[in-house]
Amino acid sequence: MSCAVGDGFMAETFPNLEAEISRYAMRPNPVVARNDPTYIAQQQKIEQSIPERFEEIVRTYPDRLAVKMGARALTYTQLNQAANRIARAILEKCGSGSEPIALLFEHGIDVIATILGVLKAGKFYVPLDPSFPLERNSYMLEDSQTALIVTNNRNVELARTSINKSRALLNIEEIGKALSSDDLGLSIFSHDPSDLSYTSGSTGQPKGILKAHWNVLHIFTSDKGRAAISAEDRLTLLHSVVFGSGKGDLFTCLLNGACLFPFNVKVEGIHGLASWLREERPTVFHSTPAVFRQLLAGLSSHDLPSLRLIRLTGTSISRTDFDLYKDKFAKRALLEILLTSTETNAICSFVTDEAFVFPKHGAPVGYPIRGKRILLLDENGHEVTRGEIGEISVKSRYLSLGYWRRPDLTEARFLPDPDGGDERIYLTGDMGRMLPDGFLIHLGRKDFMVKIRGYRVEPGEIERALLSHSAVKDAGVVACDREPKEKYLAAYIVPRENPGPKVEELRNFLKDRLPDYMIPSTFIFMESLPLTNGKLDRKALPEPDGKRPELNTAYVAPRNETEQKLAQVWKEVLNVHPIGICDNFFDLGGHSLAASHLISKLGQEFHADFQVAALVMFPTIQELAKQIEGESAKNQQWSYLVPLQPGSGHKPVFFLPGGIGGDQEFFVYARLARHVGMQYPFYGLKPRSAEGREPSQASVEEIARDYLKEIRSFQPEGPYSIVGECAGGIIAYEIAQQLREHGQEIALLVLMDSPRP
């Protein structure tokens, strides 16, 4: 017996089959037993020190180019000799023993040689950045308790400002040739400190994170498969070694015998980066999604034929970034996405090509790298069920040593292994969800999540939705404060071309993809977003100025006292000015909660009772003023119908709610109307209790009969389209029954979340 199953059945039954298959192909190597030769070889490399591994590479590739920047280039032998001289000069200044050494260099070859020299001397380095404010560098010098600053001619004067009786200075360009360039052969262990890196702290002061040699060596040994770096590769170094991604690129390259190409994006800019890439022909490109996004805007699909691997680090990768990769590089280069943190180095990664299916929500970051396990924990520290959202936590032997001089913070963020092993658990502060096969989806920072109108919102999800708009080049979203104690969302947009998209267009675009509470109230257009190390600097974004957005509706000033009063109330609620009488409340950033505030203020201003339904029906100042001023409005006959969408050329759709017609339901109607289609007239039906009338005690049949009179007075003949939600579905069903008894046709009857009639 045999049977055939059509493609349609497979597509309907397994809609994510393609994604599952493509992810399965990208899964990392399985965990190996501890007596496996592969595992033993890996452990032997991890138990080395960084200098020991580097010197092995020097012996293997003595004449191969190690680093090149502009006209300056060093082979592995030359780089090793320079590092050895620097190491001896440091030992002459400080003596032996592990201690922090501050480095003050611009992005380039000098800092690379000096890092190796510090490690060869048995010390650990503290990288400073000449472009940082003096106060920040001074804080890191004082907090790290460094006794020596190493620099070069270009930065020596800046370094002199930090010298005191307890801190010396070493200029590497004054090191004499008399110092030996041979390897030092010091005993350095994998658990010894290697570097002290400072990241932004929640208290406003940077916090130092101390790493060991094995942190670097573990990443180097875990870099396998299609993304593995070989001695034939040419790697970009775009990030400063002050940051983890820069150090990662440096050692991934030099501990594999490849050639490193530093480039200063801050100085040369994106246009300079494109020209430099064409000239140097790297095989591996590594950046943040923000830099990648800007770079690709000026490249054709034939550019950079030498690339075989593109690495993107960070959690802000969007569907647009992936589409850019597919359009420009997918035919010849793989894409690797990495999730990293300074405390853990790489956490997750996956390598993909154009076959990958990008998830609808969140940023894909892949599978845990070998030697690390991902736990998703709830607020009580318990693992959540797979598929649920939790804080991403990393369990491993190869975490950083902890926070420098902050045992309290180390104890709070680095937890002991509850099973009593030698591993620890680091709480990243990131939120995520794990798919059934172990693939991790990043859902944003725990501390970036905000509550908007009672809902927890991750700005990154809104940013990714905005980036999927064809006219948006870059986007950032932040939560801002508005009185009284209300937060609202502001979106910062970099358009691909000028003029950019209208605010109404972006708002409607998002309404088809996100809940109403995730739609930004304000949109600010910028030439570029402020970046720090390739990531969005949210603190540097300008405060929203409250200016009226560019709308499809021309500005018309208030013409009389009623319109002026309304405009003033709208301004207070929406924090927007000026407001025209033809401007739609919802196009200005209004939402259900703002509508409730507005209605309350209008009642105080005009000494009258207003309902939110009035704002849904009359969303402009001009329309609302007519209702306030017109005596006919006070005496008009009660109507169940709330017009939500005018439409044209089609029979109307009538919607019956499941509740009692409260404020929030009118906005549910309006949202549903947009999804039905703008061409359809759409009417909500409200009960008498919606405007203070006594709730009906009648039977379902009598309630349906009342509704039906209203419906048929508006549309005498069928066919009819009726939608009912929850309890409203029972009434909708009864209305359909009564219409059929009258010989009328029912074109559409939809019952949503309703009990069986």
PLM-predicted stretches and their roles:
Residues 1-13, 19, 26-35, 149-186, ...:
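AMP-dependent adenylate-forming
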Residues 3-196, 211-212, 218, 318, ...:
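AMP-binding/adenylate-forming domain of the ANL superfamily
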Residues 21, 105-109, 123-139, 153-156, ...:
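ATP-dependent adenylate-forming carboxylate-activation enzymes
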Residues 26, 57, 105-108, 129, ...:
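Conserved AMP-binding
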Residues 61-73, 93-100, 443-448, 473-477, ...:
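Phosphopantetheine carrier-protein modules
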Residues 147, 484-486, 493, 530-637, ...:
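Phosphopantetheine-dependent thiolation modules in NRPS/PKS and related acyl-activating systems
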Residues 207-236, 244-283:
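Conserved AMP-binding/adenylation subdomain of ANL enzymes
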Residues 255-258, 282-286, 296-360, 364, ...:
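Gly/Ser/Thr-rich phosphate-binding loop
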